[in-house]
Amino acid sequence: MLDICLEKRVGTTLAAPKCNSSTVRFQGLAEGTKGTMKMDMEDADMTLWTEAEFEEKCTYIVNDHPWDSGADGGTSVQAEASLPRNLLFKYATNSEEVIGVMSKEYIPKGTRFGPLIGEIYTNDTVPKNANRKYFWRIYSRGELHHFIDGFNEEKSNWMRYVNPAHSPREQNLAACQNGMNIYFYTIKPIPANQELLVWYCRDFAERLHYPYPGELTMMNLTQTQSSLKQPSTEKNELCPKNVPKREYSVKEILKLDSNPSKGKDLYRSNISPLTSEKDLDDFRRRGSPEMPFYPRVVYPIRAPLPEDFLKASLAYGIERPTYITRSPIPSSTTPSPSARSSPDQSLKSSSPHSSPGNTVSPVGPGSQEHRDSYAYLNASYGTEGLGSYPGYAPLPHLPPAFIPSYNAHYPKFLLPPYGMNCNGLSAVSSMNGINNFGLFPRLCPVYSNLLGGGSLPHPMLNPTSLPSSLPSDGARRLLQPEHPREVLVPAPHSAFSFTGAAASMKDKACSPTSGSPTAGTAATAEHVVQPKATSAAMAAPSSDEAMNLIKNKRNMTGYKTLPYPLKKQNGKIKYECNVCAKTFGQLSNLKVHLRVHSGERPFKCQTCNKGFTQLAHLQKHYLVHTGEKPHECQVCHKRFSSTSNLKTHLRLHSGEKPYQCKVCPAKFTQFVHLKLHKRLHTRERPHKCSQCHKNYIHLCSLKVHLKGNCAAAPAPGLPLEDLTRINEEIEKFDISDNADRLEDVEDDISVISVVEKEILAVVRKEKEETGLKVSLQRNMGNGLLSSGCSLYESSDLPLMKLPPSNPLPLVPVKVKQETVEPMDP
């Protein structure tokens, strides 16, 4: 019996368990039903099951171990304490670091673990610097609903430690979404002391646009093994019976070109420029465990995104799915949690700060052994076949043993109709500082030297086989962008499409020297800048046979550094933001403005790590740390750190108020004051007290309210009458111009103390004056009050005093008071 608490069910009937701390008793079923169910489960290929079938047909349910944070004195975290009793952790050598999960005893097929526990984020609430290595996507009605983040060990369970499977042969768990939860199902019996390795089920992989290796490499294992035993003279020469079939690299295939009897057939069978459904079926049939299907390697078996969808998705804020995202295959040499990731590593989650997954390859890129074993990586098809398909990004830390060679088992749809010259690849590599084994993460090769030597690399191709839709007059025009990552030029007739390639490029943070707000954004065909001819192409007139892949549409105006085309107005380019429709006088200002929407702040302060969109703002910010105030007011001799602050200050002396409210006659010296004033009309009060119902326009008002003046938590000894009166004065102050001015004062503590003192002074003086009125009425009668004169002038009213650091002249306010009519005796 298993030393865990299990629930056993058949179909949709669930039998409640009877369990104690050490043993489990299963509710028995009829022997015939039990035998039939066991036979069906053993014979079933669960890699082909849908999520509904997993939920319906699972036999055993393993719950997490109950965990109480206070039971062990806080020595363990939830992720480790929730491990079921039939599992154990796998630790790194001489370390307490968990690097995997193993079975403690035999686990039958059809057992369910879960659900996965973690922090929940929507697409809008994901923290800016969140580590997405443990993100799992939850879908509802085909749309992304939220993420489950298992990064925090204190808020997740043991399932975060399960490593992804390297190949279908090693996979023993399938991840499924049932309802709004993630569960792991055993798809094969797991013996004791075997590591649990998970991959997506078929439905889950479909939603994520991942390949499901079970369909491609495990369906016809018997057929593959039998094909190895078929007698063939040529096969026996290349592959003896006791040796696995040899795999040809592209470099070896190209060398066979000189032998018509072999090379010609290989070209026809493996490197055809067209792809059909028959090719896809052949590929599925020829899959085998000897050549596992790894998600990090690009297999472009899906159609590219339509061009209309691409155009719509280039606007900010519109999410588009990627075809294949980062996979969960860990590096074999780095078994730390940083090398593990949830299988959901989307390219959209890439940010300038999220680079933990980009580790160094375990095999040196310059080693002779690597070049000999994986020569196809330097061949004309190598990097193109692996890295240039739209939306795919093979990572550079993928172990070489997991990268299959190109041979007869990988048919023609994996290769474009013609390759990129090796010199072109070297040029791209040198420009980007990437070695030839880097596989260009999120970067497709640029066809810098499309025709080396002035001829096509394939003897089977001729000018008639090239598309006729593009003219040959631009054949020598080759793309040489400033930043090679910005433009893609894929082969036109293979599965590689220009629109899909453009869609695969993601925004990356630009360096301070680039000045581009969207560095890394691909230019679409509508606004690619017409390239200049290179010297190599000018010297090769016979290259007219090639096509101009980057033909510019002349009716559109735009720039490769912008993700959308620009319009013309009255014959001039209109630099308009496609998000907020704000226009600018020049392109550089528009680029800087786009960083506001993208959140990009490339200029960082080395002291406080604060980010800025412009270098000038960073330079002005440095004065905050140095305390330098080089600009002086000639009227009051007050000094300021920037000319803009001085200019705003001079408006106080001149009385200029350029910002006027459109609803009322109020005018202001600063735009921020007008913005705060508008909240009076819109009743927008963003600062809310968490203990009572009070809302305020200004943050300083809320802080004064929370300083012992909240009715839910009042200061000790404060009468209710005084508390009510103080809150009334806080609300009056909140809607005054003084609150707008104090909002800009840097010393927040002094502002709160000044406001609190003034409000208390008002309340105290009102109480004193009320007592004086009552005393005068009693002792002197009503004659004084009936005269209509006031006991105090407006000058006696307390005015809001600003701290010495920001003296602002205030206009005295005169309060008209009602006269008290004499009472009849």
Swiss-Prot record:
Location in chain, cross-link Glycyl lysine isopeptide (Lys-Gly) (interchain with G-Cter in SUMO2): K816
Cross-link (Glycyl lysine isopeptide (Lys-Gly) (interchain with G-Cter in SUMO1)): K816
Result of changing P84 to G/K: Protein instability caused by increased susceptibility to proteasomal degradation
ZnF C2H2-type span: 575-597, 603-625, 631-653, 659-681
Bias (Low complexity): 324-361
Entry PTM: Sumoylation at Lys-816 by PIAS1 augments transcriptional repressor activity, and is critical for plasma cell differentiation. Can be sumoylated with SUMO1 and SUMO2 by PML. Degradation of the wild-type protein mostly depends upon sumoylation, rather than ubiquitination. Desumoylated by SENP1 and SENP6. Ubiquitinated by the SCF(FBXO11) complex, leading to its degradation by the proteasome.
Residue span of region Interaction with PIAS1: 527-574
Coiled-coil stretches: none
GO cellular component, one term: nucleus
Enzyme Commission code: 2.1.1.-
Cited InterPro entries: PRDM1, PRDM1_PR-SET, SET_dom, SET_dom_sf, Zinc_finger, Znf_C2H2_sf, Znf_C2H2_type
Pfam family, one: zf-C2H2
Keyword terms of this UniProt record: Adaptive immunity, Cytoplasm, DNA-binding, Immunity, Innate immunity, Isopeptide bond, Metal-binding, Methyltransferase, Nucleus, Repeat, Repressor, S-adenosyl-L-methionine, Transcription, Transcription regulation, Transferase, Ubl conjugation, Zinc, Zinc-finger
Region (Disordered) residue spans: 324-369
GO MF entries: DNA-binding transcription factor activity; DNA-binding transcription repressor activity, RNA polymerase II-specific; histone methyltransferase binding; methyltransferase activity; promoter-specific chromatin binding; RNA polymerase II cis-regulatory region sequence-specific DNA binding; sequence-specific double-stranded DNA binding; zinc ion binding
PROSITE patterns the record matches: SET (PS50280), ZINC_FINGER_C2H2_1 (PS00028), ZINC_FINGER_C2H2_2 (PS50157)
Occurrences of domain SET (ranges): 84-201
Keyword Transmembrane part of the UniProt annotation: no
Protein location: Nucleus; Cytoplasm
Record-annotated membrane-spanning stretches: none
One GO BP: intestinal epithelial cell development
Subunit structure: Interacts with PRMT5. Interacts with FBXO10. Interacts with FBXO11. Interacts with multiple nuclear sumoylation E3 ligases, including CBX4, PIAS1, PIAS2, PIAS3, PIAS4, PML and RNF4, but not RANBP2. Interacts with LDB1, SMARCD3 and SMARCC1. Interacts with EEIG1; following TNFSF11/RANKL stimulation in bone marrow-derived macrophages, the interaction promotes the binding of PRDM1/BLIMP1 to the gene promoter of IRF8.
Functional note: Transcription factor that mediates a transcriptional program in various innate and adaptive immune tissue-resident lymphocyte T cell types such as tissue-resident memory T (Trm), natural killer (trNK) and natural killer T (NKT) cells and negatively regulates gene expression of proteins that promote the egress of tissue-resident T-cell populations from non-lymphoid organs.
Disease: In certain aggressive cases of activated B cell-like diffuse large B-cell lymphoma (ABC-DLBCL), PRDM1 protein instability has been observed. This instability, which impairs B-cell differentiation, is caused by N-terminal misfolding mutations, including those occurring at positions Pro-84 and Ile-107, and results in PRDM1 protein sequestration in the cytoplasm, followed by proteasomal degradation via a heat shock protein 70 HSPA1A-SYNV1/HRD1 pathway. These N-terminal mutations do not affect PRDM1 transcription regulation activity.
The protein's name: PR domain zinc finger protein 1
